[in-house]
């Protein structure tokens, strides 16, 4: 009677192999069994593939998001996240999102001091949500906020559909109308206004310039202090006065000042607070976001469909259960990374023919 054996590993000169099998004839493949050591098997089946780089693709069976706003032409994802005029549109829902912009990423309207805050993370924060929408109402009345009344500042580099000058829809540049004097820290409460139990992402910031401009705009040329607090996270800033080279955004006039932009995440029903002095950019429209979207670094455009998205190889179709090559983050129905090639071998222990007994 032939014995049934489970073959565990094929021994070759160039690969590790996982094997199973049953008794069969002789073959050049040597396997290691759990109980009988090395035996011969046949029928080796490759289990691994080594991918080649390809275009990123839409993930099969899943809505995949490339740009935050596909219909917002000539807009970076940071433009969309800050709601720059002419960059406001519908963000499609998606279970998977491509992080396609490479640092540093700028936004028009006004020169931003990116390194002072986590503002570069804002587009990626939004990508991590399945559903994202911009509120239709402003979260506070900026013109009548504490320390006002204010007029709302604009930039010639921010034209909108009705005016040659505008500003981000997520913030209001609060410039005192008449009371251009120094002020002690003021506090404004930021209510939760999303209506579907979403996370509320509230964008805010402050403007700073050289001493002359600070005096003209705000009546105070000293560094200003700012604090935000929401969801147990508190952030403090002190503005820089002067020392900025002139910078032009999108063909506008050279600007001597800078803005620092940050955001806070408010959970359902929770109020945030902003403590500020002169030059504050008060929050206006907020992002309401829910669900989860898996984020992976990649590139655009998305071409066709794929089983798996891999940071190094792009779109992959799963032809084998394992792969070798570069190990990196992957999402979807992906093969498993292994260090060396694997193969499945089904074969049998070779039994030499019995010797015939000589007749007497």
UniProtKB/Swiss-Prot annotation:
SUPFAM superfamilies: Viral protein domain. Its main location: virion. Residues 1-15 form the signal peptide. GO terms for cellular component: host cell plasma membrane; membrane; viral envelope; virion membrane. GO terms for biological process: fusion of virus membrane with host endosome membrane; fusion of virus membrane with host plasma membrane; symbiont entry into host cell; virion attachment to host cell. Keywords: Disulfide bond, Fusion of virus membrane with host endosomal membrane, Fusion of virus membrane with host membrane, Glycoprotein, Hemagglutinin, Host cell membrane, Host membrane, Host-virus interaction, Lipoprotein, Membrane, Palmitate, Signal, Transmembrane, Viral attachment to host cell, Viral envelope protein, Viral penetration into host cytoplasm, Virion, Virus entry into host cell. It holds the Pfam family Hemagglutinin. Glycans are attached at residues 40, 74, 160, 179, 210, 246, 317, 346. Coiled coil: none annotated. In natural infection, inactive HA is matured into HA1 and HA2 outside the cell by one or more trypsin-like, arginine-specific endoprotease secreted by the bronchial epithelial cells. One identified protease that may be involved in this process is secreted in lungs by club cells. Palmitoylated. InterPro entries: Capsid_hemagglutn (IPR008980), Hemagglutn_HA1_a/b_dom_sf (IPR013828), Hemagglutn_influenz_A/B (IPR001364). GO terms for molecular function: host cell surface receptor binding. It is found in: Virion membrane; Host apical cell membrane. It is a single-pass type I membrane protein. Major glycoprotein, comprises over 80% of the envelope proteins present in virus particle. Binds to sialic acid-containing receptors on the cell surface, bringing about the attachment of the virus particle to the cell. Plays a major role in the determination of host range restriction and virulence. Class I viral fusion protein. Responsible for penetration of the virus into the cell cytoplasm by mediating the fusion of the membrane of the endocytosed virus particle with the endosomal membrane. Low pH in endosomes induce an irreversible conformational change in HA2, releasing the fusion hydrophobic peptide. Several trimers are required to form a competent fusion pore. Homotrimer of disulfide-linked HA1-HA2. Belongs to the influenza viruses hemagglutinin family. This is Hemagglutinin. The gene is HA.
């Amino acid at each position: 009677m032939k014995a049934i054996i489970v073959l565990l590993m094929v021994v070759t000169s160039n690969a590790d192999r996982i094997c199973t099998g049953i008794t069969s004839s002789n073959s050049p493949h040597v396997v290691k069994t759990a109980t009988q050591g090395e035996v011969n098997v046949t029928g080796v089946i490759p289990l691994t593939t080594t991918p080649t780089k390809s275009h990123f693709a839409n993930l099969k069976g899943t809505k995949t998001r490339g740009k935050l706003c596909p219909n917002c032409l000539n807009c970076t994802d940071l433009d969309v996240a800050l709601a720059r005029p002419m960059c406001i549109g519908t963000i499609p829902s998606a279970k998977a999102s491509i992080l396609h912009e490479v640092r540093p990423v700028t936004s028009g309207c006004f020169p931003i001091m990116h390194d002072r805050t986590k503002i570069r993370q804002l587009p990626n924060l939004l990508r991590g949500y399945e559903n994202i929408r911009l509120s239709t109402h402003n979260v506070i009345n900026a013109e009548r906020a504490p320390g006002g009344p204010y007029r709302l500042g604009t930039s010639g580099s921010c034209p909108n559909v009705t005016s040659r000058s505008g500003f981000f829809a997520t913030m209001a540049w609060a410039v005192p109308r008449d009371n251009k004097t120094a002020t002690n820290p003021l506090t404004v409460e930021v209510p939760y206004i999303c209506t579907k139990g979403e996370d509320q992402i509230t964008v805010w910031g402050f403007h700073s310039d050289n001493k002359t401009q600070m005096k003209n705009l705000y009546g105070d040329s000293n560094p200003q202090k700012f604090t935000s607090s929401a969801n147990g996270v508190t952030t403090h800033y002190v503005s820089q006065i002067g020392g900025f080279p002139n910078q032009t955004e999108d063909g506008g006039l050279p600007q001597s000042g800078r803005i620092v932009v940050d955001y806070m995440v408010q959970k359902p029903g929770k109020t945030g607070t902003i403590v500020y002095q002169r030059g504050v950019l008060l929050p206006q429209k907020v992002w309401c976001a829910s669900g989860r979207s898996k984020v992976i670094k990649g590139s655009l455009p998305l071409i066709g469909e794929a089983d798996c998205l891999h940071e190094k190889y792009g779109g992959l179709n799963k032809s084998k259960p394992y792969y070798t090559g570069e190990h990196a983050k992957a999402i979807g129905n992906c093969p498993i990374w292994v260090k060396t090639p694997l193969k499945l071998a089904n074969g049998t222990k070779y039994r030499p023919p019995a010797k015939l007994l000589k007749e007497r």
